[in-house]
Each structure stands twice: as C-alpha cells, then as structure tokens.
Regions:
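Intrinsically disordered, low-complexity regulatory regions
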Residues: 1-180
Length: 180
C-alpha cells in the first residue's frame, strides 16, 4: 500500500505540472465551461484512448498517457466547477486554481486509499483497457445525472463520478509509468 501512495503522488505530480504550465499559458480559461462541457471533454479523451486501444495505431503523435493525464486534470476542473459554478470570464488566479487543484487531488488520494484498503488493490490485476471502459461508463452515468439536473434517487452524484474517473486514470498512469 505504501508504494501505491507514492505512485499516486508521482503521477499526480506529473498531471499537476502540466496543469500548472497550461494555467500559466492560458489562465483559467476553463472557468467558462459548464460541468456538462467538462464531462464531454473527458468523453473525448476517454473515447480516444479506447480508439487507440482497439486500433493499435494513432494518426496524432500522442498516446494514451497524455489522455489519462487530461482526464485527471479535467476531472479536477469538473470538481472545481461543481463547487464554484462556471464563470463568464477567466476569474481565477493561478494560485487559487492550484490551491483548489491540490485540495481535490488530496481528496482523490484519500478516496483511493480507502477504497484500496477495502478492495485490496484489485485494480493492480486489471487491464488498462478496463479502466478505459470504466471511465466511459462513469461518463455515461454522469451524463444521465446531468440530464436529471444532478438529482439522483439512490446513486452517488456527479462529483463522485468525477473522483472515480480521476482515480481510474491514475491507475492507468501508474501501470504505464511503472510497467506493472
């Protein structure tokens, strides 16, 4: 379990580094996105991963690693947007965006550690393609919940689905980074 925490922190640091660099280049332009648009953006990334997994080749010189990183970052953006609502302008400083990023990354780590304890690291025996399918399933669930204006009868909400998408992406990145 100790390795899992360190591996999680390692891949989240990679994701955060890219997030911070894009934040510097573009500002928090993503603040204008409604959560449903964030969900669609995650869909594009997950669908591309699945397409690459099935076809085995890419026409664009980026593999699945960059798409898993994007899903982590868009998942955190989605959580921020759910908390604050979308904005009409880029209304957030880099410092505030990184503070929120770190808070949600920490929550994702805590959730992963709790689930990892209960499921005894079952994710390590799974295929990366299964994470892709689980992310796509979570996206479809999220779209259904968004279609119901966020209301559910018995299911977890949009935020829980974003957290799961983040963690499945982290699992994929751990497998890709550490060759497990």
């Amino acid at each position: 379990m100790k390795d899992t925490k360190q591996q999680f922190e390692h891949v989240i640091a990679i994701c955060r580094d890219l997030f911070a660099k894009k934040l510097h280049d573009y500002g928090a332009a993503w603040r204008i996105m409604r959560p449903s648009s964030v969900t669609d953006q995650i869909f594009i990334k997950a669908n591309r991963i699945r397409s690459i997994e099935i076809k085995g080749v890419t026409m664009v010189d980026e593999g699945i690693r960059s798409e898993f990183i994007a899903i982590v970052n868009y998942g955190i953006i989605g959580l921020i947007q759910l908390e604050l609502g979308y904005a009409e302008t880029d209304d957030m400083t880099e410092e505030r965006a990184l503070e929120l990023y770190d808070r949600y990354a920490k929550q994702a780590l805590e959730l992963m550690l709790a689930k990892n304890h209960d499921y005894d690291e079952a994710w390590r025996s799974m295929r990366v393609s299964s994470y892709t399918d689980l992310i796509l399933m979570k996206i479809y669930r999220t779209k259904q919940i968004e279609g119901h204006d966020g209301a559910t009868l018995v299911s977890e909400g949009i935020d829980a689905n974003y957290m799961d998408m983040i963690n499945y992406s982290v699992f994929g990145l751990i497998k890709l980074e550490f060759g497990e």
